[in-house]
Amino acid sequence: MSQLEQVIKSRKSVRAYDPEFKIDKKELEEILEIASSAPSSSNLQAWRFIVIQDQEKKKELTPFGNNQAAIDASSAIIAVIGDAEAYKNAQEIYAQNVELGYMDQAIAETYATNTYNSYSTLPQQVLSQFASYDAGLISMQILLLAKDRGYDTLVMGGFDKVDFAKRFELPENQFPIALIALGKAKAPAFNSSRLPLEKIVTFY
């Protein structure tokens, strides 16, 4: 079994954390930077993050998350935010590609213009769906990177997103998707079963 397979199979949703264990800011930044290599629609990277390490702010967040103990006891909470107007960053993203030598100026300008024109006419609901899907891709990378470094995680989708958005003053184009708790398990996670492959896969 490869190291990647071991990490994938060992990742569990941990709900009980050691409140004394801390992960420093630099390591969280490293995890997020590597995770940002995740694919995204037109490479627009429609994800944003709010990282909460301050204990008082985590306690303030707890009621939004149905008083789940993991919020208060974990080392950090990463709030995954979607950006429905990520297409407005197309020019910046393609300019970076030129600077890094990934494409020439003319191609970059064409891509940036076409991307902006295509996405700017889409309904808000569709843009939000793109952002939510892409946020799922980078979230999985965060979970696996954390596990590879010996940390445990829990993804929480059931929280008061309206109050969260108000508390952290999210602009109208941004919306909360999930909270990810990171830390060190105080108690092992429950094992969970998976449906058999023939139940979920169809080959043609």
Question: What are these model-derived regions, one by one?
Answer:
Residues 1-204:
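Acidic, surface-exposed loops and disordered segments
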